[in-house]
Structures are given as structure tokens and as C-alpha cells.
Amino acid sequence: MNNFFRIFSILKKFAKAKYYFLLPEKKDILIFDTNGADLIKSILPKNSYHILPTRYESLNFLFLINCLFSFRIRMRSYLQKYVDYINPKILITYIDNNPLFYELKLKHGKKFFIQNGRRTALDIFFSKNKLKKKKFYFVDYMLVHNDIIGKKYQKLIRGKSIKFGSLQSNSCKVIKSQKKYDLMYVSTFRQGYTQPDNFLFGIKYSNYIKKEIFFLKWLRDFSDKNKRHISILGSERFPTEGEKQFYKNIFGNNDWRYIERTPKRKTYKIIDQSFIILGIDSTLIYEALSRGLRVGFF
């Protein structure tokens, strides 16, 4: 039954994909995955790169046919044929937790990844079944946030780690101006917050978030007592009703503000204009600290 649903899911993806019937243009740099590609493009020379979609959003018909005739109808085989054809000098990605990237082989080029977010023991990339270093998990260079996380990557992947910081944060200049916001709480809300009996990495959501709820209630009481204003920097993309309701259940109708996560939201400008940034485990918290801002971790 599981195989049936897996095949059905893949067929749905094939049905929704856009198809291209011409061979892609060969470039020196191949960007693996469209997510984060704009950030990588910003540090590359113009017209030096080609982007390889990896999420079935678009597929090259010629490579698919090649896979079909070789009896290897798998995304890994498709991606490998694509990479073999481009034969780039550099294969780079912003999606550092996709195992497919590490399994791809280059004829002559170098492989790079740029760490895109905070990694923890609960991250799928660091789950228990991946603790042993895979022989075929290899990159030439890992551009990581710091030396500590670099050492953790090297327990799993062969390659050299380089302290690089956050590309996204570093791409936005620090704005030193008058503070517009008082207490800015960086939300890490997920849909599971409203489904306490669901599990995350083997932990019930009710247990996963109980300490955060305890802290938020303390923050509510503290701000009421000291006449401080709280803003919530939203995490969820549309729809946001569940996230808004989660915080409303805690803060009620008190003096607080919810800032939606929209494509046009200037997130780094907002935290630069905040008096204190607070949070639990968001990458943005670490980025705020690296920007020289006042930060509280809990």
C-alpha cells in the first residue's frame, strides 16, 4: 500500500511539472535547486550559471527519456544525467540538507554547499540514522555558519568546512537607526503547534512546545508589569490564521503586534530596528546576534 501511494505521489508531481524539450545551455556553474538560487546568483558573475530544478517543478524531457531507456526512473538518476551533460566546473547549492546533492558525482568540477539555516539534533539532517559518515557523501567545500557546526558536518560528510556566516544576513546591510520596535519575539510556529497530539522527531508537539508557552506567558506578564510592547515576527507563510490564533491565546487582547511573513517583508530591517530580539531556536536569532543586536535566547 505504501508503494502505491509513493508511486501515485510521484505521478502527481510529473503531471504538474513543466516540461522542456531542448537541452540546457552549458555553464561553468550549476546551481542545485531553485530554493536559495537568487542568493547564490547575487554573488556570481552574470551569465555564468545555470539553475537545476530538483523538486519536479520543471523537467527536461530528453533526460527523462534517457532515464526511461536505461531503466533508471529515479530523481537521483535524472539529476545525475543532467549534471553529466552540463559538466560544470562548480556544482553549488543553498539546500545543504538534501542527501541527493551529496550523492551526485562530478567528472572534473568541485562541489560546494552554503549552509542555509540552523542545524540541531532534531533536524532531519542530523537524525539518528545518519550519524555515521556516508562514504558517498562528499563535497569539496562546506560554507558553514561557524567552526562548531562545521565540525558536526564533517562527522557526516567528507569535505573541507569553511566559516562563512549567513549568506542571507550578510547580503543585507545592518541599518543603524532609531529603534521602532521594543520587544521583538521571533516566532518558530509550525502547524503542529495547533495539533498537540502530533509527533515531531518522536516527540509530542505538546511536550515540544510547553517550555516555549511557559516563556511566552512569562513574557506577557513581564511586559504588562513593566509597560513594554511585544511584537511577534511571524514565521508562517500564508495562511497565517493558525499562528495568529496561537499567540492570541497567550497574549489575548493585550498591547501586542503580529507582523506577517510576506514576500515583501524586510525581515533584517525589522530586527535592526528592534530594541531587543527574543526567541527560542530560529536561525534569525543567531543572525541577529552576528549583526551586533541585543538578543535573548531561551
Predicted feature locations:
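Conserved beta-strand elements of the Class I
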Residues: 30, 182-184, 294
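Short, surface-exposed amphipathic charged segments that create phosphate/polyanion-binding patches used
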Residues: 62-71, 127-129, 174-185, 268-279
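Active-site and donor-binding regions of nucleotide-sugar-utilizing enzymes
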Residues: 3-171, 284-285
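Nucleotide-activated donor-binding/catalytic signature segment of Leloir-type glycosyltransferases, i.e.
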Residues: 244-262
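Hydrophobic/aromatic residues located in beta-strands of well-ordered beta-sheets
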Residues: 111, 142, 230-232, 295
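Conserved catalytic-core segment of nucleotide-activated headgroup transferases in glycan assembly
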Residues: 40-46, 167-249
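A donor-sugar binding/catalytic signature common to diverse glycosyltransferases
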Residues: 93, 116, 153-154, 161, ...
